[in-house]
Amino acid sequence: MADAKAVAKAELKSKDFVPRGNKSSSPLNTTLYLGLRALDCYIQYLILSRATGSFIIKFFGGSIIPHGPPVEAGFMHIEKLGLSGYRLLLLFMDILAAAKHFWFVLTVAEEAWTLTGAIVVGLDNIFFDTLNNLLFLCAATSAASSKAGGETLANPYLATGFIIFAVGLVTECVCEIDRKVFKKNPMNKGKPYTGGLFSLVRHPNYTAFTIWRSGLALASGGMIYGMSIAMFFMWDFSNRAVPALDEYCTKRVSYGPRDSTSTNWSRIWLLMTSSLVRRYVGRV
């Protein structure tokens, strides 16, 4: 394999929010991004628990689903949230995703955050989480509508969505940990990691992100919405993030013949998810 070399920003034609190869410190931009991730969790709580989400839906002429009974967990701080078990689990998934991003930024990531990247990625998460929960509250689109099974923990959309979410989030963490361990070894400096899941898929972390995002969408807005989110991120990664990363890696070090394995695996996952939901939910 050829030796790794530095790649100047001017050499890269693809657009990406991550300044590849720039490992300088960016405390202000990093703090801004993490602040937006924390704010996202509070916004989702307001949407799920108070009149914020209901007001938005009614403003646009929609109707909302009935609020399920508050969960009785035996823990005062949880019960004070006033959320049903379904809504509490949706909020929990949002918080877990944000916690994963905190962990990644503070312990794994090496590239500096740009101001644009911090704002765009932070607002992107707020947008999709807000869209999820507004569609959950809207009677016409909710995965918890009476037709879909109601706002109960036994709702098949919630159960299936949570499993998919957990698989995707854990897989993404495993990918990042494996790659981090590989990079910490001085003998691997400048080498691309091709072990673990990276030996099967060129970009397993992008695939895993798509998986957990689609699981969260499924639990909020049902199967059609969940599949739409999966297809959107497959398109976004295939046309933006993957070409940008591949270009950087190709210019930095010989990577071997390029393939589209990650995209194919994402499509395979989409088909598997569709079959799984059809089996347990019984409707599209």
From Swiss-Prot:
<comment type="similarity">
    <text>Belongs to the class VI-like SAM-binding methyltransferase superfamily. Isoprenylcysteine carboxyl methyltransferase family.</text>
</comment>
<keyword id="KW-0489">Methyltransferase</keyword>
<feature type="glycosylation site" description="N-linked (GlcNAc...) asparagine">
    <location>
        <position position="205"/>
    </location>
</feature>
<dbReference type="GO" id="GO:0032259">
    <property type="term" value="P:methylation"/>
</dbReference>
<feature type="glycosylation site" description="N-linked (GlcNAc...) asparagine">
    <location>
        <position position="29"/>
    </location>
</feature>
<comment type="function">
    <text>Probable O-methyltransferase; part of the gene cluster that mediates the biosynthesis of ustilaginoidins, dimeric gamma-naphthopyrones isolated from different fungal species. The first step in the biosynthesis of ustilaginoidins is the production of gamma-naphthopyrone precursor YWA1 by the non-reducing polyketide synthase ustP, via condensation of one acetyl-CoA starter unit with 6 malonyl-CoA units. YWA1 is then probably substrate of the ustZ to yield norrubrofusarin via a dehydration reaction.</text>
</comment>
<keyword id="KW-0808">Transferase</keyword>
<keyword id="KW-1133">Transmembrane helix</keyword>
<keyword id="KW-0325">Glycoprotein</keyword>
<feature type="transmembrane region" description="Helical">
    <location>
        <begin position="215"/>
        <end position="235"/>
    </location>
</feature>
<keyword id="KW-0949">S-adenosyl-L-methionine</keyword>
<dbReference type="InterPro" id="IPR010721">
    <property type="entry name" value="UstE-like"/>
</dbReference>
<feature type="glycosylation site" description="N-linked (GlcNAc...) asparagine">
    <location>
        <position position="264"/>
    </location>
</feature>
<comment type="pathway">
    <text>Secondary metabolite biosynthesis.</text>
</comment>
<keyword id="KW-0812">Transmembrane</keyword>
<dbReference type="GO" id="GO:0008168">
    <property type="term" value="F:methyltransferase activity"/>
</dbReference>
<feature type="transmembrane region" description="Helical">
    <location>
        <begin position="88"/>
        <end position="108"/>
    </location>
</feature>
<feature type="transmembrane region" description="Helical">
    <location>
        <begin position="157"/>
        <end position="177"/>
    </location>
</feature>
<dbReference type="Pfam" id="PF06966">
    <property type="entry name" value="DUF1295"/>
</dbReference>
<keyword id="KW-0472">Membrane</keyword>
<protein>
    <recommendedName>
        <fullName>Probable O-methyltransferase ustE</fullName>
        <ecNumber>2.1.1.-</ecNumber>
    </recommendedName>
</protein>
<feature type="glycosylation site" description="N-linked (GlcNAc...) asparagine">
    <location>
        <position position="22"/>
    </location>
</feature>
<dbReference type="GO" id="GO:0016020">
    <property type="term" value="C:membrane"/>
</dbReference>
